[in-house]
Amino acid sequence: MQLVAETRDSARITAVALKAYARIVEAWALSLKEAAALADMSESTWKRARKPDFSGDLTKDQLLRLSAVVGIYKSLELYFSDPLARTWITRPNTGPLFGGARPLDSAIEGGLPQILAIRTYLDALRGGA
């Protein structure tokens, strides 16, 4: 019985995470390639995963990435006004984590550790640290 409940919970968590991520991808106007790479998926998997009837599983790394991206999105929306909140991730940035690169490219290249670093960086900006 517990295994059934855990499976249902896992499926719900995956569905919610993918729905939120799809909305963020749209808000940020990311390409299919960028969205897939940021989530550490192949383009074909992302095409399937963004559909409401997706029944696949995500790895722990992928779920953590999606969670961190939601946090990044939230911080950007709270810290900046539009259009900067929606375009910050795709603009070249001279901040300490980026060295002139786009935060998106930095996140894709650096994987989960860099995505988490970006989230921490934005949370610190928002908190005034």
Language-model regions: role of each:
Residues 1-129:
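Non-transmembrane "mature" sequence context
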